[in-house]
Amino acid sequence: MLKNNKRFLPKLIKYKKYSEKGGYLIPFENVKKRIALGNNCPIKIKRIFFSSAKKNAFRGDHAHKLCSQLLFCVNGSIKIETIFHVNKKKNYYISRNKNYALLLPPLVWSKIYFKSKKSILVVICDYKYDNKKEYINNFDQFINISKKKFI
């Protein structure tokens, strides 16, 4: 059992964004030491996907057993509702205008709301896609697993 292990808490991470000539660049790399130009990705990059939805629609509504994810918004604004350590809840907000990404460790239930008409979410994962073995789609099952791990 783990009690409030910080490794299993969602965390906002500031990243560098470079703007010039009417555009911007956000580099992420897997390196042992932070270099001057890029952002050191806090997880190993195994998979990347993009997601969008209509304004006020949501995606997610699940947790992962093993996968950590780094979520950042490249257009619009996004709200992420999280539940972790059985019953702790916290909302996070990320947007194109703020240079923060959200690190979601395993065993965090998340529901992602697209707050703008053209919001786009980029997700970096440290685990391959495996819906049957890796996803927790049932909230009661998530609570039971969390109780065993954190209480």
Predicted regions and their residues:
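Non-catalytic, conserved peripheral segments adjacent to functional cores
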Residues: 1-100, 117-118, 124, 129-140, ...
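Well-ordered alpha/beta subsegment
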Residues: 97-101, 107-114
